[in-house]
């Protein structure tokens, strides 16, 4: 199945095949979500069948919006598709851009809308094995320490978010 994503080609936003966008390092739209439960972050380990960064740990979920799909709608859709999570209302926290080598000759050059959703003890997480190998709740301070000690276990974008954007994304958690 060919997946088309919104990407800029010669300054014009157009629909581009997802793999082509990553091979060429085209600037493209993306959405990232962090689900928090108190001071813990719901992390996922990417499935081994993913075409880039398989097996690495990353934020709760991330994706590319469909053409004309609002970022908020995309965030809710992807929480359900990747993790079976329903009923959360992600709040927009940040808009950022980054470029990172994700291995295998692929480049992520994303313009990202970042969302945070608050969960409670009743949250049900049912990972889709085509997307997610494992999930884990990690206290924010422990996450920062783990990423610093073992950066190769985490996606490049998560490392960028924590290094350059933690205060904006996580607010008080990042300031403690």
From Swiss-Prot:
Reactions catalysed, as given in the entry: isopentenyl diphosphate = dimethylallyl diphosphate
Main localisation: cytoplasm
- Swiss-Prot/TrEMBL keywords: Chlorophyll biosynthesis, Cytoplasm, Isomerase, Isoprene biosynthesis, Magnesium, Manganese, Metal-binding, Photosynthesis
Q: In which pathway does it act?
A: Isoprenoid biosynthesis; dimethylallyl diphosphate biosynthesis; dimethylallyl diphosphate from isopentenyl diphosphate: step 1/1; Porphyrin-containing compound metabolism; chlorophyll biosynthesis
Give any GO molecular function from the UniProt entry: isopentenyl-diphosphate delta-isomerase activity
Give the cofactor note: Binds 1 Mg(2+) ion per subunit. The magnesium ion binds only when substrate is bound.
What are the GO cellular component annotations?
cytoplasm
List, from the UniProt record, the residues annotated as the active site of this protein.
62, 110
Name the UniProt record assigns to this protein: Isopentenyl-diphosphate Delta-isomerase
Encoded by which gene? idi
């Amino acid at each position: 199945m060919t997946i088309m994503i919104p990407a800029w080609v010669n300054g014009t936003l157009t629909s581009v095949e997802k793999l082509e966008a990553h091979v060429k390092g085209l600037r493209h739209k993306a959405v990232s979500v962090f689900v928090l439960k108190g001071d813990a972050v719901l992390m996922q380990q990417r499935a081994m069948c993913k075409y880039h960064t398989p097996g690495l740990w990353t934020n709760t979920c991330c994706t590319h919006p469909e053409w004309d799909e609002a970022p908020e709608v995309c965030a809710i859709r992807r929480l359900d598709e990747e993790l079976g999570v329903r009923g959360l209302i992600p709040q927009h926290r940040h808009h950022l851009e980054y470029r990172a080598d994700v291995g295998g000759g692929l480049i992520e050059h994303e313009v990202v809308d970042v969302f945070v959703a608050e969960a409670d003890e009743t949250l049900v997480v049912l990972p889709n094995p085509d997307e997610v190998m494992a999930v884990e709740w990690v206290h924010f301070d422990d996450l920062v320490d783990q990423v610093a000690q073992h950066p190769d276990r985490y996606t490049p974008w998560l490392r960028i978010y924590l290094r350059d954007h933690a205060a904006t994304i996580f607010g008080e958690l990042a300031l403690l």
